[in-house]
Regions:
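N-terminal cap/lid segment of alpha/beta-hydrolase-fold proteins
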Residues: 1-12
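Conserved alpha/beta-hydrolase catalytic His-Asp/Glu region
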Residues: 129-131, 148-208
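Conserved loop-alpha-helix segment in the C-terminal half of the alpha/beta-hydrolase fold
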Residues: 213-247, 253
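Flexible "cap/lid" loop of the alpha/beta hydrolase fold
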Residues: 109, 116-146
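Post-His helix in hydrolase/transferase enzymes
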Residues: 253-265
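Conserved HGGG/HGGXW glycine-rich cap/lid loop of the alpha/beta-hydrolase fold
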Residues: 11-66
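Gly/Ala-rich beta-loop-alpha elbow adjacent to hydrolase catalytic centers
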Residues: 96, 100, 104
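Active-site loop/oxyanion-hole signature of alpha/beta-hydrolase fold enzymes
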Residues: 54-95, 261
Length: 271
């Protein structure tokens, strides 16, 4: 994996790529809010010698800093497209965990024919019809919660709340410690992320996935209403849904072998 950069009007995005043949399948891993490229370590280790792989530190996250908080979800999708073009990628399978899954859906809205596949890991649908007005109202007002909550408790609840295994919890804690001593930045990243998510929902666009897709969700995912959303998303769209037994919100860190197998089977069917 080689660390690379992509310049934007708001700052520089850092990403890691291993691309041997850009005309073959490329797995594009998008971590969730406040997580960074390390979220997918177990996937990168497994797949980097099988497929092309790309993973980023999302805008304003970890090494993609300094970065102005003057962008929306569609800017993120456009910058992702810039990275894929920069690498000459023609067959991308976008694999988004949580917020990364929302970026994937925004990408599908902007570039409906450019994705070869889409995998949502513990994410949820972006369509307005799935969320209540109260949920949108709350999303817009999360930053003060993260700014004023004691950091020690945030670290504990943030890591224990998203994973069921020691590996998953320790990894999330390590990623959160990137912002140790700068809780304001952590709160800004989280608050801004939730606001641009709410704004994308309020746009009330179709966000239709036109390529083969797969939903994955941990059976112990207690972040928001992920389990409920995935059931309805599956029911309404008929996109296959795979439950990751015993896994939390970061299910790819709790049950990497199970998640890797599902990704492998999915890609084999579309190759």
């Amino acid at each position: 994996m080689k660390e690379k950069t992509c310049q934007t009007r708001c700052g520089t995005i850092h990403y890691w790529a291993s691309v041997s043949n850009p005309d073959t399948i490329t797995l594009v891993f998008l971590p969730g809010l406040t997580a960074d490229h390390r979220l997918f370590d177990k996937q990168i280790q497994y797949f980097e010698n099988i497929y092309n792989v790309i993973v980023w530190d999302a805008p304003a996250h970890a090494s993609s800093w300094p970065f102005r908080f003057d962008f929306d979800l569609f800017d993120k999708a456009k910058w992702l497209n810039d990275i894929l073009n920069q690498e000459g990628i023609t067959r991308s399978v976008i694999i988004g965990q949580s917020m990364g899954g929302y970026v994937g859906q925004a990408y599908a809205q902007l570039y409906p024919d450019k994705m070869t596949g889409f995998i949502s890991i513990d994410s949820a649908p972006l369509q307005r019809s799935y969320v209540t007005a109260v949920e949108i109202w709350l999303l817009k007002r999360m930053e003060p919660v993260y700014a004023h909550y004691p950091w020690k408790w945030l670290l504990k609840s943030g890591s224990e709340g998203v994973a069921t295994t020691d590996y998953g919890r320790n990894l999330m804690r390590e990623m959160m410690l990137t912002y140790d001593g700068n809780q304001k930045r952590y709160a800004q990243i989280a608050g801004h992320g939730y606001r641009i998510l709410a704004a994308a929902m309020e746009k009330d666009l179709p966000y239709e996935i036109k390529c083969p897709a797969l939903l994955m969700c941990g059976t112990q995912d207690h972040a928001g209403s992920c389990i409920r959303y995935n059931k309805v998303w599956h029911r309404n769209t008929k996109i296959p849904l795979t439950w990751i037994e015993g896994a939390g919100h970061n299910s790819n860190t709790d049950r990497p072998e199970r998640v890797n197998r599902s990704i492998e089977e999915f890609v084999a069917n579309i190759s």
